[in-house]
């Protein structure tokens, strides 16, 4: 489990940045509700000073965007619960909130905001020290890329366009979720997410040499990189 102080303070951002030094996500090995909770607690994206937190924020933002979820909202209060505020999201529950804690245990069997034990803190420090001290060659990194692919006109068969795009297969390239987004005049563009192994795939080269040349350019007019984030 992970616990953070006020995430809109320097201390909170520093804690988050250190936590993400050896992790791609808040907990586990894929995006979860924990990432959404922390993402929502941040009033604005972390600055480049917090390299790891900024990288994580951009990645979660891209995942939300491809899922059709806006990163902004007008605020919400659920009857019988506290407003979603910095304190409610980022601060551990008060000691006398026994009933609320019991309900959370029934739902998840995990106290998401409990404090780290000494063993967990020590293990996290050892992992961070190991990463900094390691002289071994790092494994090739991965990146998450969101691409806009535009057709020639409103008569372009978008199903065939998507099939043509996904027909591009190479080592280190993994196609993900996609959706059609209206752009006007009856025309829709394909927005698609992919994951690449940085040392094996160049997105720019793939666009220039495969996505915009024959036979795929029968359907594809142009491609734009919307988001590019290290993971």
From Swiss-Prot:
Basic and acidic residues: bias regions: 119-129
GST C-terminal domain segment(s): 10-73
Keyword Protein biosynthesis attributed: yes
Location of N-acetylalanine modifications: 2
Classification via InterPro entries: eEF-1beta-like_sf (IPR036219), EF1B_bsu/dsu (IPR049720), EF1B_bsu/dsu_GNE (IPR014038), Glutathione-S-Trfase_C_sf (IPR036282), Transl_elong_EF1B/ribsomal_bS6 (IPR014717), Transl_elong_EF1B_B/D_CS (IPR001326)
GO MF term list: translation elongation factor activity
Signal sequence region: none
Keyword Protein biosynthesis: yes
Gene Ontology cellular-component annotations: eukaryotic translation elongation factor 1 complex
Keywords: Acetylation, Elongation factor, Protein biosynthesis
Domain of life according to the entry: Eukaryota
PROSITE patterns hit by this protein: EF1BD_1, EF1BD_2
CDD domains: EF1B
Subunit structure, as described in the record: EF-1 is composed of 4 subunits: alpha, beta (1B-alpha=beta'), delta (1B-beta), and gamma (1B-gamma).
Physiological role: EF-1-beta and EF-1-delta stimulate the exchange of GDP bound to EF-1-alpha to GTP.
Sequence similarity: Belongs to the EF-1-beta/EF-1-delta family.
Protein name, UniProt field: Elongation factor 1-delta 1
Taxonomic source organism: Arabidopsis thaliana
């Amino acid at each position: 489990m992970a616990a953070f102080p006020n995430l809109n303070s320097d201390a909170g951002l520093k804690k988050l940045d250190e936590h993400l030094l050896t992790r791609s996500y808040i907990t586990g090995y894929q995006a979860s509700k924990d990432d959404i909770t922390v993402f929502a607690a941040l009033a604005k994206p972390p600055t480049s000073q917090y390299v790891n937190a900024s990288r994580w924020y951009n990645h979660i933002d891209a995942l939300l965007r491809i899922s059709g979820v806006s990163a902004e909202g007008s605020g919400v209060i659920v009857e019988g619960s506290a407003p979603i505020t910095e304190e409610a999201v980022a601060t551990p529950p008060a000691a006398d909130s026994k009933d609320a804690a019991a309900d959370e245990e029934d739902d998840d069997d995990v106290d998401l905001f409990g404090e780290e034990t000494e063993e967990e803190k020590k293990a996290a420090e050892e992992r961070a020290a190991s990463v900094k001290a390691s002289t071994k060659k790092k494994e090739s990194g991965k990146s998450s890329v969101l691409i806009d692919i535009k057709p020639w006109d409103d008569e372009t068969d978008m199903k065939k366009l998507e099939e043509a795009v996904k027909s591009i297969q190479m080592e280190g390239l993994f196609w993900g979720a996609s959706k059609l987004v209206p752009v006007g005049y009856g025309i829709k563009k394909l927005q698609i997410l992919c994951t690449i192994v940085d040392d094996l795939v160049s997105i720019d080269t793939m666009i220039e040499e495969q996505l915009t040349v024959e036979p795929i350019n029968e359907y594809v007019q142009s491609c734009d990189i919307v988001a590019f984030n290290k993971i």
